[in-house]
């Protein structure tokens, strides 16, 4: 799915168009379509942290044209490491996508409102180890 970036992803302010697709049962990829060769690995935060909760500020809701009927998704960026358990998740800057109008924003959460969310949390803290 091709998406228009309505509010820049930090550090990638010139990127206006991205492609979002599923890699496997857990991970997704958000790839630049603006001639720049970069992408982000993403995960649905609720798969690993069911208590993840935040309010999308009005500004971002307006940019995305969100309302009660909007079909939308929330994803967080993962920095993949070896072994996978050493990978980190950024819960402090979720990416919100409006599937109805193919747009996205990165929401930067206020640390004073969300003191339990960090930009580099080990994924191993949220997944069960299977042996």
From Swiss-Prot:
InterPro entries: Flagellar_assembly_factor_FliW (IPR003775), Flagellar_assmbl_FliW_dom_sf (IPR024046). The keyword Cytoplasm applies. One of its GO terms (biological process) is bacterial-type flagellum assembly. One of its GO terms (cellular component) is cytoplasm. Keywords: Bacterial flagellum biogenesis, Chaperone, Cytoplasm, Translation regulation. It is found in: Cytoplasm. NCBIfam families: PRK13282.1 (NF009790). Interacts with translational regulator CsrA and flagellin(s). Belongs to the FliW family. HAMAP family: FliW. Acts as an anti-CsrA protein, binds CsrA and prevents it from repressing translation of its target genes, one of which is flagellin. Binds to flagellin and participates in the assembly of the flagellum. This is Flagellar assembly factor FliW. It comes from Campylobacter lari (strain RM2100 / D67 / ATCC BAA-1060).
